[in-house]
From Swiss-Prot:
Catalytic activities: [protein]-peptidylproline (omega=180) = [protein]-peptidylproline (omega=0)
Domain PPIase FKBP-type intervals: 165-250
Protein name in the entry: Trigger factor
Domain of life from the UniProt record: Bacteria
GO biological process: cell division; protein folding; protein transport
Lineage, broadest ranks: Bacteria, Pseudomonadati, Pseudomonadota, Alphaproteobacteria, Rhodobacterales
Keywords for this protein: Cell cycle, Cell division, Chaperone, Cytoplasm, Isomerase, Rotamase
Amino acid sequence: MQVTETLNEGLKRGYAITIPATELEEKVNAKLAEAQPEIEMKGFRKGKVPMPLLKKQFGARLMGEVMQEAVDGAMNKHFEESGDRPALQPDVKMTNEDWKEGDDVNVEMSYEALPAIPEVDVSGVELEKLVVKAEDAAVTEALENLASSAQEFEAREEGAASEDGDQVVIDFVGKVDGEAFDGGSAEDYPLTLGSNSFIPGFEEQLVGVKAGDAKDVTVTFPEEYGAEHLAGKEAVFSCTVKEVKAPKAAEINDELAKKFGAEDLDQLKGQISERLEAEYAGAARQVMKRAALDALAELVSFDLPPSLVEAEAKQIAHQLWHEENPDVQGHDHPEIEPTDEHNKLAERRVRLGLLLAEMGQKAEVEVTDQEMTQAIMQQARQYPGQERQFFEFIQQNAQMQQQLRAPIFEDKVIDLVFDQAKVSEKEVSKEDLQKAVEALEEE
């Protein structure tokens, strides 16, 4: 086997591989000899089929296998000896298309090599960790929100009209073209006005009603309504108002705390403080992570594989286009050309991605099975009732596993950077932290 370099420009590599016909022939014969004892053929005892007959029967198929194995072996040997790591799957093609048995096999292989990543010393990197304490006002606001979510309704004074946010208890019968329809009637139904739980326009017409009132509510079902026989049609709901109730927030006391699993109000306040500070810490981490990535980007410079940058730029352009055009699904749209800004961002992402991967590999960073399981279960919660199917899908899909593994790996490498860098704490207000987070989104 002969391997000749044909291209070596920057990260681009090209090689001509020649596999001698004699080598292929030897490997085919070896495979036939290995299989011969187990082969049965009409007119011959098991293991006694002559080699020429075996070659005629199976030679062509085995030659295809041998050629593929030889090319794969040549590639693997080349990468082991050269130390090159291809950025993407190498492009391999056979150049003698008129090949026939007895000819050498000529193959061209081209690829872009991953660059050598320089050592990075982050001990001199200065990072600022924003710290926000849970203030009493924030805890009180959270308590008020909990009390509001635990609200109850109590009857308004006799003759009082309903207001937006009130609950009305109604009997109703819905009709289309004068005929009642399935699912269009109920008794003693508690409807919160302003909840938008009914057909658009329904709840607004019940604002101002009183207990004992009878009112016809006329609405039009949306064109995209689930029941096709009702979609786009006008309906009249004859409603009888039985009660009008005003919302009453739960009192902030030990009883409220018990509703949310705490022993008393003090424990609930403590839990809220911990949750708030955990949220603040998560946001502060994102701010410090961006600062760390900015610092790393300034510390290193190396050539990037054009194919990786191009693929990343296209992905960025495609994602941003869909964010601006949320109504368009899939790829049914004109081709999206990346801009200079997309290319610049792609270069940063590829450079940092390669750097973090190298740092993690040298530090022997690993994503544990437990961490992967937690990540999968977190994603599975988005598909209630189908968690098991989602879990099985991930187990059988290596690409999806990598998509879940990558951010975990990256965060563990970032933790290494935090440990080695000079980190100082700065106590700030919740508002200042929010501004810092918003600044990340604007970049």
